[in-house]
């Protein structure tokens, strides 16, 4: 340690306090990294790692590895490190190096973590970036999230035996990028697995001392006010503990007042439809199962928003379907009004187009990280608001009129920004030249000196050329030497004695004169004074905007909601949706319903619509049979998606629909081995079914696909029947259930259990070919057509025919009729060729090489086989 320079000791002291972060240490115009941080940054960012030589006579700092990045390009590098799961501590020079006596003071100004990102380079425009606070202890669970880029904050709490299930559902809903946990939550292996493995969430464990009720309440009151703190439940302190610890963590890492974090949404269980992670995944609400892409999801269909705020809000609506009939009706009525008035809707959409991200722009302004360009972007967004107010005033609908009453046009703020800043200000606010001409007399005066000084420099250059005869003479400037006279080597003999040499170049020399230095002082002092004054004016403007943060956020919220409503209306018109009736009836009645995503993914194909009727008593459970690939899963998913769409206030893809409020949607679809946890497909299936039976209510909608597969036939059939009986029986669960199965024996339940109804997917056979009609019809299927589907999938004909023989034998042993199949042990008889095999033979025929006679003989042969 004795060998360290003062600067290196300063670095080590700061690094000691931030061991879990990569330290960006400001040195002039660069952020430097040393030691292990340098090795990590070099590897992750593809930076050149420089290592001082190993000479024992060299000081400590000369021996350690180092690398660096330009400070003005740091956002992109930070984004890459955050994406790889690192934390980055930003250490700045906290005093002017020119005024420093000795070592420049430095300190951590901010710690960037996955959940505390504000820079646009690190953020997805249409998605919130949440940091979560989680408290789990005994019977209580508390959950809170905050997106510091927008100020959006939510908090809730749970208690009782299902508290962890509810907590996991909320984690799936908000998908935080980072979570701070109390010891009880950190030691919960299932919770950690969900966070780290499934959600890819960065986890920070905080000590129990950070979760103290008095301190939490004080922090919440300071941040949101007394009224907000008073709304939090007193009988379950977990909400307050989770939120208080989260706010503490945000203040600790951000080193600033989060004044824009002033909107607290406390919500209770029962305000929104619950969807567990499995249901969200299977229904592909925001991303596809396989590619994890937006295209192919329900969000892809519905999202025609024009603003980043609207895109984030629409995603939130999909994640949080409503349970209040009146709240749904307000959205529904607004969408209906927009659908009805085409011209006004299109004008509104045009006014929304081009509005910048007011929420995140305001967040950066309050944060102190915004530049002049951010403020001009905010002003440009505000310029759209008066036109939106005017367009909204033309509507008669109640909710749209409420929105216009809430929309502050912010004309005064837009005028202040426009009067203060140039239309296209430079990137930096520290070097001047961004305040509008005429705004401040002193700025104008200093600029006159600056611009006049540049003219004087040009005149001096011309005079020196003429006086010395040096044609290549030029006067330049850099931050090291200031102004200088540069002369090429070919004219060195003409340099006057009054020139003082300062630097030798490859092709020439640089000089100064006393006259040039005197002029430099006058110009640079004016430049420094102008830059300082312009920055002072900028900070005043920033404070004006900070004082209006609530107004700006309120306007942004209205714009976002209006954008969502316009998006839903545009989609409804384009895709021919209907306005559903949403009530408390407990009935799901759909006429000619369609799958919203499938019909958009295949616009050239004709989608076959289907009816649905499910009541509280009759048709409570539908057993759906039919072959694979016929459309059972598509049908069940489309019912679930239409229910969800109706409960976010959207129109639905049908001719008519009536949707009784559904409190939860559960799905058990497809196979998903959890090999990392040592669980087989069947174990995962049974675990999911167990969760459904434990958490579902009579108001839930269950989508169950092929329960019981993965074990022996009789085991699977027994489990499937027992599950269906439990779901359909009103004395046990009585939930609305769509139950797809290949166990045709279960169709006998229609006559034995009230509320159970059989349906099947219609198919048409032609010989041994099968045509899927995609139509749901009453009654059970007589067979599964598995072998026909296998043939369509391309299995060799010998395998297909062997399967037919085995099926016939099995059905004979079971006492069931089987179609006649002629087969040999090793060779298939020619007379047993099906229509499909004739087609296969035609496909294999090399038509171009056949003579006319050979072709005719082949045709006779094939016709003979068919007969």
PLM feature segments, named:
Residues 35-38, 236, 240, 306-307, ...:
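ATPase nucleotide-binding head domains, primarily ABC-like/P-loop NTPase cores
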Residues 328-331, 351, 355, 453, ...:
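Intracellular alpha-helical coupling/juxtamembrane segments of multi-pass membrane proteins
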């Amino acid at each position: 340690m004795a060998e360290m320079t003062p600067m290196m000791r300063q670095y080590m002291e700061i690094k000691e306090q931030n061991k879990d972060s990569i330290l960006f240490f400001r040195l002039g115009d660069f952020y430097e990294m040393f030691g292990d941080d340098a090795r990590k940054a070099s590897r992750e960012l593809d930076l050149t790692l420089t290592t001082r030589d190993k000479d024992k006579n060299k000081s400590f700092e000369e021996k350690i590895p180092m690398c660096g990045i330009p400070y003005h390009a740091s956002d992109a590098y930070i984004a890459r490190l955050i994406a790889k799961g690192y934390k980055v501590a930003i250490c700045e020079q906290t005093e002017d190096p020119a005024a420093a006596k000795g070592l420049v003071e430095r300190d951590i100004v901010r710690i960037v973590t996955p959940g505390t990102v504000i820079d646009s380079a690190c953020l997805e425009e249409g998605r919130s970036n949440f940091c979560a606070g989680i408290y789990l202890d005994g019977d209580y669970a508390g959950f809170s999230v905050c997106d510091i880029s927008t100020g959006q904050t939510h908090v809730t709490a749970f208690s009782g035996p299902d508290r962890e299930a509810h907590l996991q559902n909320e984690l799936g809903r908000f998908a935080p990028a980072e979570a701070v946990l109390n010891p009880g939550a950190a030691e919960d292996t299932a919770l950690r697995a969900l966070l780290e493995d499934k959600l890819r969430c960065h986890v920070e464990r905080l000590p129990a001392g950070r979760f103290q009720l008095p301190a939490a309440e004080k922090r919440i009151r300071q941040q949101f006010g007394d009224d907000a703190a008073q709304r939090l439940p007193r009988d379950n302190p977990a909400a307050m503990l989770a939120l208080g610890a989260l706010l503490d963590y945000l203040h600790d890492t951000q080193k600033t007042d989060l004044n824009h974090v002033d909107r607290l949404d406390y919500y209770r269980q029962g305000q929104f439809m619950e969807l567990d992670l499995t249901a969200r995944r299977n229904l592909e609400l925001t991303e596809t199962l396989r590619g994890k892409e937006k295209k192919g999801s329900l969000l892809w269909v519905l999202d025609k928003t024009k603003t980043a705020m609207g895109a984030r809000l629409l995603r939130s609506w999909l994640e949080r379907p409503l349970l209040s009939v009146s709240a749904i009706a307000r959205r529904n009525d607004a969408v209906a009004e927009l659908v009805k008035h085409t011209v006004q809707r299109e004008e509104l959409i045009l006014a929304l187009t081009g509005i910048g991200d007011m929420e995140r722009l305001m967040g950066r302004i309050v944060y102190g990280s915004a530049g002049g360009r951010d403020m001009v972007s905010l002003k440009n967004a505000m310029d759209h608001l008066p036109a939106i107010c005017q367009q909204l005033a033309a509507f008669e609908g109640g909710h749209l009129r409420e929105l216009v009453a809430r929309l502050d046009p912010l004309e005064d703020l837009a005028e202040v920004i426009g009067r203060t800043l140039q239309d296209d200000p430079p990137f930096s606010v520290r070097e001047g030249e961004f305040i509008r001409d005429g705004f401040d007399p002193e700025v104008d005066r200093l600029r006159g000196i600056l611009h006049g000084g540049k003219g004087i420099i040009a005149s001096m250059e011309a005079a020196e050329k003429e006086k010395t005869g040096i044609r290549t003479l030029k006067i330049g400037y850099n931050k090291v030497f200031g102004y200088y006279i540069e002369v090429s080597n070919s004219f060195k003999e003409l340099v006057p004695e009054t020139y003082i040499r300062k630097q030798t170049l490859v092709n020439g020399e640089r000089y100064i004169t006393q006259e040039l230095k005197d002029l430099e002082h006058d110009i640079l002092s004016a430049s420094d004074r102008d830059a300082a004054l312009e920055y002072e004016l900028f900070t005043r403007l920033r404070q004006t905007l900070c004082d209006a943060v609530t107004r700006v956020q309120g306007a942004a919220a209205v714009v976002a909601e209006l954008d969502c409503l316009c998006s839903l209306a545009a989609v409804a018109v384009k895709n021919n949706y209907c306005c559903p009736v949403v009530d408390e009836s407990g009935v799901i009645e759909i006429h000619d319903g369609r799958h919203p995503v499938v019909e958009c993914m295949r616009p050239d194909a004709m989608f076959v619509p289907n009816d649905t009727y499910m009541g509280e008593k009759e048709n409570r459970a539908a057993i759906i049979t039919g072959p694979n690939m016929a459309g059972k899963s598509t049908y069940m998913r489309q019912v679930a998606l239409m229910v969800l769409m109706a409960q976010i206030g959207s129109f639905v893809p049908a001719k008519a629909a009536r949707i009784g409020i559904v409190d939860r949607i559960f799905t058990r679809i497809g196979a998903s081995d959890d090999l990392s946890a040592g669980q087989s497909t069947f174990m995962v299936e049974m675990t999911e079914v167990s969760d459904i039976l434990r958490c579902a209510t009579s108001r839930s909608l269950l989508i169950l696909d092929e329960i019981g597969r993965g074990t022996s036939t009789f085991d699977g059939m027994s489990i499937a029947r027992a599950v269906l009986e439990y779901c359909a029986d009103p004395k046990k669960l009585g939930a609305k259930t769509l139950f797809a199965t290949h166990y045709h024996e279960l169709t006998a339940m229609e006559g034995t259990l009230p509320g159970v109804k059989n349906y099947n997917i219609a198919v048409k056979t032609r010989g041994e070919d099968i045509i899927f009609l995609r139509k749901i019809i009453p009654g059970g299927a007589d067979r599964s057509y598995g072998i026909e589907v296998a043939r369509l999938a391309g299995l060799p004909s010998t395998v297909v025919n062997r399967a037919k023989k085995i099926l016939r034998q099995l059905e004979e042993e079971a006492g069931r009729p089987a179609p006649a199949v002629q087969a040999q042990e090793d060779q298939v008889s020619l007379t047993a060729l099906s229509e499909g095999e004739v087609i296969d033979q035609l496909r294999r025929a090399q038509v171009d090489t056949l003579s006319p006679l050979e072709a005719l003989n082949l045709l006779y042969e094939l016709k003979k086989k068919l007969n």
